[in-house]
């Protein structure tokens, strides 16, 4: 029967230490090979925590599935910040172009509850509220209202 290990690793910088090593060691597979493969697959997410699922079958073969980092991590990377605001709504941690919010929405679309790109972008803008990031210099709630009013329909074409 296949064993599955789900972990959150730093993109491109996974090591054989915790959380991977202790989880994979008892399964009897080459942990270094798994770590090298994970680092190759997560290199584009450098500096972000990435969800990874390692499945090991009875013959000690492994497959690696790389998830998409949390929306918060993607927003912070696109905004060029390492931490969100300590007081979202009062202190601004950074600014995000609307195009970046659309790009994040497209990246995360399959895992979202939204039916269309417009709703997915509003979900990303909601995350911006929590992180304390403005969008195009506006507060995220103002931007959500503008999206609802159709001001950005040209940008939000799927």
From Swiss-Prot:
Keyword Ribosomal protein recorded: yes
Species: Methanoculleus marisnigri (strain ATCC 35101 / DSM 1498 / JR1)
GO annotation (BP), single: translation
Single GO term (MF): large ribosomal subunit rRNA binding
Protein name listed in UniProt: Large ribosomal subunit protein uL11
Family the entry assigns: Belongs to the universal ribosomal protein uL11 family.
Cited Pfam families: Ribosomal_L11 (PF00298), Ribosomal_L11_N (PF03946)
Keywords noted in UniProt: Ribonucleoprotein, Ribosomal protein, RNA-binding, rRNA-binding
């Amino acid at each position: 029967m296949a064993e599955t290990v789900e972990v959150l690793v730093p993109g491109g910088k996974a090591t054989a230490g915790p959380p991977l090593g202790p989880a994979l060691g008892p399964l009897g597979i080459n942990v270094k090979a798994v770590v090298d493969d994970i680092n190759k697959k997560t290199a584009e997410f450098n500096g972000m925590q990435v969800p990874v699922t390692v499945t090991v079958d009875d013959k000690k073969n492994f497959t690696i599935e790389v998830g998409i980092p949390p929306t918060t991590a993607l927003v912070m990377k696109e905004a060029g910040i390492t931490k969100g605001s300590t007081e979202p709504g009062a202190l601004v941690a950074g600014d995000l172009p609307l195009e970046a919010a659309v790009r994040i929405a497209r990246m995360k679309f399959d895992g979202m509850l939204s039916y269309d790109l417009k709703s997915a972008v509003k979900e990303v803008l909601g995350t911006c509220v929590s992180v304390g990031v403005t969008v195009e210099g506006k507060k995220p709630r103002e931007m959500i209202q503008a999206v609802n009013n159709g001001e950005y329909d040209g940008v939000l074409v799927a």
